[in-house]
Amino acid sequence: MQETRNKRQIIILLVLLACIVLALTFSPGRSSFDVPPDYYREFNLREVDRVEMKSAGKDVSLNFNNSRWQVNNEFSADRGLVEVLFATLQQAEPKRRVASSMRDSLTRVLREKGVLVSLFNGENKAGAFFAGGNAAKTQAYFLKEGDDQPHLMAIPGYRVYVSGIFELPAIQWREKLIFDLNWTNFRKLETNFRNPAGNFTVEMARNQAVIPGVAEPDTARLNTFLDDLSLLRADEYLERTRALDSMSQSQPLAEYQISDIGGRVYSLRVYDYDDKFLGLTHAGQFAVLPREHLIPLLRPKEFFIKR
């Protein structure tokens, strides 16, 4: 009797064990059949010094050069966007495999219309994958180069379109800081308005900003003005068009020209642009400028005279 009871308990335990194994195998949690979370980051990001993002006619190359990232070896990259790029590479994880019914078609789309993201350490390729998504930009997919199984991607805890950072055109990678210079080398600022009576110049004299012709300037206002100018950032850059080129031939609302002790000149011409402002930089780029940040920079000369 006892022996029969023991056998029955053993059978029950074996059945329970089998159920546990099956539950673990087919549960929604990770199993041996799931793709590992680091499947698309099998590289050391600290060693990456070049990132190439290639798509149809929109190649972008980010190179680390002399403590700064450069875009296509033409201009400095926006530091904030570079941080977003590396955060995406570090945190993006496969959420699940793409269903077999759409695997082949999505693989073809990613290879033909997606962005090929390649990471390098010197001349050595550390990794590469295709990035893309649906038309609504609500679902992102990655496909490792040489593979035929795409994955739906996500950043745990966030609802973002993961592939968006890889799809930016080169112009949007440009440093958004308008006057990207070492302000300790500042020598002179010339500010001109449509009404010449408001024009003024700022120079450095004994390590202090002064306005020639103004015996006693309001230093608090002047220093705030210079701080605001040094921190002015573009919301975005625009590709050149005939309409923008035509606008640039008209008289600007304001023009700022900064020179440093090395003889380099940085300029900005400002125009009305819908509910914002449009700036034309010394590099010939059209920049959309936030209205709330530019209005304080339209102060005329008399504003800085101490009362």
Question: What residue ranges belong to the model's regions?
Answer:
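Secondary-structure "cap/kink" motif recognition
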Residues: 1-307
